[in-house]
Amino acid sequence: MITLKRLVGSSIVLAMLVILLGAYTRLTDAGLGCPDWPGCYGFLKVPEQAHHIEQAEALYPDRPVESHKAWNEMIHRYFAGTLGLLILAIFLFSLKHKRLLLPSLLLALVIFQAALGMWTVTLALHPVVVMGHLLGGFTLLSLLALYWWQLQPAPFIAVKHSLKFLFWPVLLVLAAQIALGGWTAANYAALACIQLPVCEAGWTSQLNFDEAFSLHLGYDNYEYGVMSQSARATVHVMHRVGAVITLLVVAAYAIALWRNSSGLIKTLSLTVLLLLLLQFSLGLANVVLHLPLANAVAHNFVAANLVMCLVVIGYQLHRNKESAYV
């Protein structure tokens, strides 16, 4: 059991690192730094010698080797592959403990994540795939956290009964907002509006929902986006509106939990509230500072931790039937 706990704990840390590297890869426009998968220009690592670069560019004449982008992509793949091996080890160690639901889900999800990583390249950054890959990473982190807590003794929870059931709509609101954020990033719409509080003057007359939420099938390459400016602005505006709704809903829930609980739930609810305020501030900074790299990566990372903490709260509220609900 100790070995299993250590494996899960290590996987959580590694999953966080993979999420950071994934955001960095995307934000440095390195998603196609290697135009093939799982290698890079036909090599196991980035080609660096002159004759290897010549071979690579002969194989992909439309994709000249950009070493820094290729390394960003390959480092992300190396760490993601290591995470996959750790999760396989978790599954194998879990066989003797007879708790296979979460390990099985984790193994299935990490395999699907690998497939999404491949499709990200082979489908040239299709927005649906990119968004799905991001959501899959967040889900993987949350499931790892759930499994870690499943391996711990169940704490006694005392909260109002209504707060247990309110968890699900609150989680849905947060998940929808994260999906909007992923759609914004995947369609290169983060700088479609650079004024506060909503967008540039006259934005209401430019809203284009049909194009903003179209699947945009049939393009050969989605790098840097295929949407019109009006569609990108629409996506951006909806993400801002969603941010305000999410701030109000999740903050109200976290405050209610904090006021009506103790121990672990009280600590987690305060953590959610602080992460929520930090995330909203990072979003504002992205607009005001025109998407600085470190800030944008942090915005992605805090979102992952926010959903993880909220999911853990939900798990703790539902796991112990002997807990007191009043």
What are these regions (language model features)?
Residues S10-L21, L102-T120, P169-Q177, T267-A285:
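Small-polar-interrupted transmembrane alpha-helices in polytopic inner-membrane proteins
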Residues L101-L146, Q150-P153:
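Long, hydrophobic, well-ordered secondary-structure blocks that form the structural core
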Residues L146-L163, M308-V326:
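A juxtamembrane structural motif centered on a specific transmembrane helix
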Residues L92-S104, H161, A254-V272:
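Membrane-interface helix-loop-helix junctions at transmembrane boundaries of multi-pass membrane enzymes
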Residues A30-E73, A190-A231:
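Extracytosolic (periplasmic/ER-lumenal) interhelical loops and adjacent juxtamembrane/interface segments
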Residues Y24-D36, A114-L134, T184-Q195, R232, ...:
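Interfacial helix-loop-helix junctions of multi-pass membrane proteins
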Residues W71-L88, V128-L140, T234-A252, A296-N305:
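Membrane-interface loop-to-helix entry segments
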Residues R6-P38, V173-T184:
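N-terminal signal-anchor transmembrane alpha helix
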